[in-house]
Regions:
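Alpha-helical metal-binding/catalytic segments enriched in His/Glu/Asp
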Residues: 87-88
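Extended beta-strand/beta-hairpin segments
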Residues: 1-82, 92-181
Length: 181
């Protein structure tokens, strides 16, 4: 079987599996997909080191140590949560920059709750943003986070639709939880 045929078969199987039981993520206000420039597929190469570790990265690029024990590198789940933090963080910075709102500091903590049964998948994620910037108003920060988490972050959009994702923030030292919770 050629690589192209294998990819076609995997794509077909994924579409069938999705239609067979996966719920479609409800569209958020303004989240209709619009055509974008076609990009090459993302490609990562992972090399096993003989233990419960892999070194993974773009071909010819820097690598990241994935460690099933968590002793010498991040676990695969840690990397997934890190990807969500990085993705939403980059989107937040871009959104605030477009509004000419300078950010002095952005820290993100991600807490992933896992199921008690194998495969111990993530069932809920809480994102905690700490943002500092003299000119940032609460509504600007809230809007940027909401857009990042619910519209623009491709990592978020790639997660299972039944994962509950919530967020809170501290803006210039003042805590805030959307909805007053």
């Amino acid at each position: 079987m050629s690589a192209s045929a294998g990819n076609d078969a995997r794509t077909k199987a994924a579409k069938q599996q999705q239609g067979a039981g996966a719920a479609e993520r409800p569209a958020t206000k303004g989240s209709a997909t619009k055509p974008v420039e076609k990009r090459a597929p993302s490609r990562i190469h992972a090399t096993w080191d003989g233990e419960q570790r892999f070194d993974a990265g773009r071909p010819g690029g820097k690598t990241l140590r994935l460690d099933g024990t968590g002793k010498t590198g991040q676990s695969p789940v840690d990397v997934l949560l890190s990807a969500l933090a990085g993705c939403t963080g980059i989107d937040i910075l871009e959104i605030l920059a477009k509004r000419r709102t300078p950010v002095e500091r952005l820290e993100i903590e991600v807490v992933g709750d896992r199921a008690d049964v194998v495969p111990r998948r993530i069932i809920a994620i809480q994102l905690i943003y700490r943002i500092d910037g003299a000119g940032i108003e609460r509504d600007q920060a809230e809007r940027a986070i909401d857009l990042a988490v619910n519209k623009y972050c491709s990592v978020r959009e790639s997660l299972a639709t039944d994962i509950v994702i919530s967020w809170s923030m501290t803006l210039n030292g003042e805590p805030y939880t959307p909805g007053g919770a």
